[in-house]
């Protein structure tokens, strides 16, 4: 029985040497290495390990398993979440990642369905997809609010790089689709409708994210004074709710509103009214995709790449990337990050190698 990551890695290395193992898929609750002293090998995750909780300041990573050269010093097993094992990257270890094999996880999510039933359905649809001769010729890319610092200059070249990397998707009109967060006030429905397409092969999301949410868009641009006012009130109500449990912080917010912008408390009126809270919550929901919605709309894109923070955080019982593959749709593969990822970069570099 595999009680700790070392047990799993020992089997992997043995198979690699004996049978030239190319990769592994971890099915179920395989021990999760929680890595520390290795933030220099992440693109954006930077958190003080001394003054923050171990769970939050460690990186869940299977590089422990698939990069045989990396060396680690065992620290402890989590006393509450027993599947977590904490390690420091050893001083004598290589300080760069060069994986010897590929690795992936098939992990049930907390959607109310029995875990074994989820995994069984997943493998059935994987087998079904492998039996179909389906070439990659339908592509979709979405760029959310905040990605590339909202630069049109940085966003525009994606069409040219995709054309070079996957020329087949440009053979006919409509095979490659690109949507940006400001194409409409709330592009969420357009994105979901795209993901529901039964012919969609590959999708990429450039966005902000959390384990439980894809952040698609922000507050829509306004061009009339009454819309400006409504947008500002919506923003300050949200700010007030975030600070209401800290009197000092709340008072500082009121001072800032008054002394910097000349705004009185009428601009946050209703921030603690249940009716207004519900209305604001529904408006906020239009700007992103949450876990339950993934299960509802059943994404069919065969592969989805999440160029986003935390959408692939497999230490959680439920997370966006897991919901995609465990849905009843045809999605069978996701590529996502377990922690923060750098936004301002060429995210599609070498994508054509797939």
Predicted regions: what they are:
Residues 1-354:
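Cysteine-dependent hydrolase recognition
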């Amino acid at each position: 029985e595999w009680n700790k990551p070392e047990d799993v890695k020992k089997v992997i290395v043995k198979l690699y040497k004996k049978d030239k193992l190319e990769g592994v898929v971890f099915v179920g609750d395989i021990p999760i290495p929680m890595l520390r002293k290795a933030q220099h090998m992440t693109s954006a995750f930077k958190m003080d390990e001394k003054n923050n909780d171990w769970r939050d300041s460690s990186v869940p990573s299977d590089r422990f398993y698939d990069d045989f050269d990396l060396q680690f010093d065992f620290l402890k097993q989590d006393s509450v979440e027993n599947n977590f094992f904490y390690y420091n990257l050893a001083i004598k270890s290589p300080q760069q990642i060069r994986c010897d094999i590929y690795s992936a996880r098939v992990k049930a999510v907390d959607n109310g369905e029995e875990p074994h039933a989820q995994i069984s359905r997943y493998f059935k649809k994987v087998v079904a997809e492998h039996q179909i001769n389906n070439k990659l010729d339908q592509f979709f890319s979405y760029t959310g609010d905040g990605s590339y610092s909202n630069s049109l200059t940085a966003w525009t070249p994606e069409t040219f790089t995709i054309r070079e990397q996957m020329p087949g998707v440009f053979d006919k009109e409509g095979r490659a689709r690109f949507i940006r967060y400001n194409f409409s006030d709330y592009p969420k429905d357009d994105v979901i409708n795209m993901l529901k397409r039964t012919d969609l092969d590959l999708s990429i999301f450039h966005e902000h994210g959390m384990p439980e949410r894809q952040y698609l868009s922000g507050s829509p641009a306004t061009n009339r004074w009454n819309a400006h006012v409504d947008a500002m009130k919506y923003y300050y109500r949200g700010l007030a709710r975030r600070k209401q449990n800290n009197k000092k912080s709340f008072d500082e917010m009121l001072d800032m509103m008054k002394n910097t912008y000349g705004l009185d408390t009428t601009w946050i009126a209703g921030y603690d009214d249940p009716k207004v809270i519900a209305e604001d919550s529904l408006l906020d929901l239009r700007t992103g995709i949450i876990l339950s919605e993934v299960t509802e709309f059943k994404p069919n894109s065969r592969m989805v790449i999440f160029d986003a923070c935390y959408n692939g955080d497999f230490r959680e019982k439920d997370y966006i990337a897991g919901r995609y593959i465990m849905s009843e749709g045809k999605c069978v593969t996701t590529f996502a990050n377990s922690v923060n990822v750098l936004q301002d970069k060429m995210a599609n570099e070498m994508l054509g190698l797939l």
